[in-house]
């Protein structure tokens, strides 16, 4: 019987340090805390030490990403030394009997690709494919589970609709075009991985959110229906049916896109209440009395159960690729983990095939706009000395791994 995957997740830019060739905004001073992502956690140099933290948690898997801009600093020039670094990481994980879950793209892009328009460029799926074709042969012998793209909807919305992330665009039309190109980039990547190793298991890490009507009004309910479909369903629909529906595309069908995921990777954090607004797509409203995380969104781990039940219709296995909480005082995190794992247990009892859980994150790290102010880690990091210390919630998670027999 296949073992349930217990693990944590990180991303290259947030933990490695030394990423000087990508597009992230600290170079323009747009990080709220004015923090720099260097040296971050120095995971690039300390990964062996950090893998011991994974063993401390009794985990048998680890999700991490490679940094495109390290490997291909200039278009078409691939740094073999950097590729070998990630091979070393994979080899070390295998030695420790830790299943690697490898993410090929986690938000950042090389500067040369940014100058070409990034994922707005019609040629971006081909450009990304060229990168993937180069690196996958090095990793294929070590990796069974692949994530092609992390949170494509988040990347498109925050970077191209709201303008909070690079490149700072504020255009619904452009964000939809980016989503379409990310769908096609996934399609090309899926083919490359499967060509290299047929038995590989491939997906995206899909951020999913619960939307509720702020009022018991017809228009609020219509907004909820629209947002749930746009945010949660349409991307997955494209990867299962092969049809890129409006507004992401023009209802066009790609045979290579159909059934181009082997499981569904789910990133779940919270729910939001929304109301109709005549001048906006929606308006978010906070309910009185709800508990908030340090990030400002609602503490609602129970929502994972509803998300998992909603996904049952796809008839795919499910991996929780991220689930976590910013909690500097570590007062809520242990309970959050317990309730999240209980949600998985209840969903499995309803016939949902969940085969793993990755807590976000292994350790405190560089949060995209908030710098080092948001503490997601099971391990606290002193960013002056880079010392790692387990929080109480690390012991909670470790004990949960021991006590649950999925």
Model-derived segments and their meaning:
Residues 1-31, 35, 75, 84-406:
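Active-site region of glycoside hydrolase catalytic domains
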Residues 10-12, 53, 66-70, 106:
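Short glycine-rich, polar/acidic loop-and-turn segments at beta strand-coil junctions
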Residues 24-52, 57:
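Aromatic- and Gly/Pro-rich amphipathic surface segment
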Residues 46-67, 259-264:
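Catalytic domains of carbohydrate-active enzymes, especially glycoside hydrolases
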Residues 57-83, 102, 112:
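Aromatic-lined carbohydrate-binding/catalytic grooves of carbohydrate-active enzymes
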């Amino acid at each position: 019987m296949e073992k349930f995957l217990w693990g944590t997740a990180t991303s290259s830019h947030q933990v490695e340090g030394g990423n000087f060739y990508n597009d992230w905004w600290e170079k323009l001073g747009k990080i709220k805390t004015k923090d720099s992502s260097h040296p971050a956690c120095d995971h690039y140099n300390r990964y062996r030490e950090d893998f011991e933290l994974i063993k401390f948690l009794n985990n048998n898997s680890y999700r991490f990403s490679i940094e495109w801009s390290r490997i291909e600093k200039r278009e078409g020039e691939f740094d073999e030394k950097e590729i070998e670094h990630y091979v070393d990481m994979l080899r070390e994980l295998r030695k420790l009997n830790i299943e690697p879950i490898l993410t090929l793209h986690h938000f950042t892009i090389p500067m040369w690709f940014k100058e070409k328009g990034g994922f707005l460029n019609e040629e971006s799926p081909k450009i990304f494919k060229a990168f993937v074709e180069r690196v996958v042969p090095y990793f294929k012998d070590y990796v069974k589970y692949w994530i092609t793209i992390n949170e494509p909807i988040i990347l498109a919305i925050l970077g191209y609709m709201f303008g909070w992330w690079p490149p700072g665009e504020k255009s619904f039309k452009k964000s939809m075009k980016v989503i379409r190109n990310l769908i096609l980039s996934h399609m090309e990547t899926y083919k490359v991985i499967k060509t290299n190793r047929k038995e590989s298991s491939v997906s995206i890490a899909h951020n999913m959110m619960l939307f509720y009507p702020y009022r018991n009004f017809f228009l609020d309910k219509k907004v909820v229906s629209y947002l749930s479909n746009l945010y949660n369903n349409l991307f997955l629909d494209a990867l299962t049916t092969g049809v890129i529906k409006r507004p992401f595309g023009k209802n066009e069908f790609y045979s290579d896109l159909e059934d181009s995921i082997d499981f569904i990777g789910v990133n779940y954090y919270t729910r939001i209440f929304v109301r109709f607004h005549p001048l906006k797509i929606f308006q978010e409203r906070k309910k009185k009395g709800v508990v908030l995380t340090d990030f400002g969104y609602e503490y609602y781990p129970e929502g994972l159960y509803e998300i998992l039940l909603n996904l049952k219709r796809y008839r795919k296995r499910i991996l929780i690729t991220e689930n976590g909480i910013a909690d500097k005082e570590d007062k809520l995190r242990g309970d959050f983990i317990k309730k999240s794992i209980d949600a998985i247990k209840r969903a499995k009892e309803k016939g949902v095939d969940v085969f793993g859980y990755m807590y976000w994150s292994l350790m405190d790290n560089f949060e995209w706009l908030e710098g080092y102010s948001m503490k997601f880690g099971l391990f606290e990091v002193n960013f002056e000395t880079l010392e790692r210390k387990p929080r109480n919630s690390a012991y909670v998670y470790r004990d949960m791994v021991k006590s649950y027999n999925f």
